[in-house]
Amino acid sequence: MRVLRYTACTTRHTCLNTVIFNWSLCMTVIPVTEQRNPASYQIDTKSTEEILTIINNEDKKVPYAVEGAIPELTKLIDRLVPLLKKGGRLFYIGAGTSGRLGILDASECPPTYGVSADTVQGFIAGGDDALRRSIEGAEDDENHGVEQLKSAAFSSSDMLIGITASGSAPYVLGAMKYARSLGSPVGAISCNERSKTFELADFPIFLPVGPEIITGSTRMKSGTAQKLVLNMITTTAMIKLGKVYNNFMIDLMPVNAKLEERSKRLINEITDCGQSRAAEVFGESGKKIRTAIVMASLGVDKTEAEKLLKAGGGNINFAIDAHAKHAD
């Protein structure tokens, strides 16, 4: 394969034609995530504002790439939700940026939706040390991911999603093969249409963001697209699990002053009970927003609110309806 070289010059048109020609020779053998982006040729000669504009223009393509994956994401989530309802878990596995994004999404589910830390878990090649610094070669260990899944007692009741921009990391592929051997549902998120992970996935999520503006720097568009998709997966799943009322997160964990104030404001907005009453039921409920909403809505105490919620399967509307039927 021909090595590509160029030097900055005033005859930009001539240089650009040469580079495009050479680039086209490589397209059939290099994954799209490793290809050069024509929009950023000679980016090292640009002004600061020009560089930022190039980056921004490329980033605008990301939401459209994600939009195309919605049908397959729908299938994945519709399989995931019943699994979670039965006590199953969601696991992410990835190397580098992909692994960090999976762990980030998993770590934000407990405080946002009140689920246990076991419900959504993330693993990264190289372990926790790789969260803060790059551990070279970790993604080449095909057995490491398998060992991590075994340590978490991963089973056929759980779902695994492999996250990898290029789709070729042995660490991810090994874990996906193991999950499939157990009969677990397996998803894959990749920005390369010929991703090896897609061959192992029940739910292939292809994100065609194209080449990065810095060749091979998949922490950029690829990482952004992956983050958007992970947001969509867990947010939609939690909505379907009843963790959201209207567009409020009613199971958030008020672990600091900011979140306590948000919780009181949320109770007041939903019930229109007044801020002082919202603060009162928030405290009486043991800082459980869902319980406080029923207390404020129906004028019942914590014990009765919890009984109604249990009868309604945790659904606030069902709890209120059950109270109304009982009153009749």
Q: What residue spans do the PLM features occupy?
A:
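Gly-rich Lys/Arg/Thr-decorated short loops/hinges at beta-loop-alpha junctions or inter-strand turns
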Residues: 56-62, 122-133, 272, 286
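Short, amphipathic alpha-helical interaction segments embedded in low-complexity terminal/linker regions
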Residues: 232, 237-328
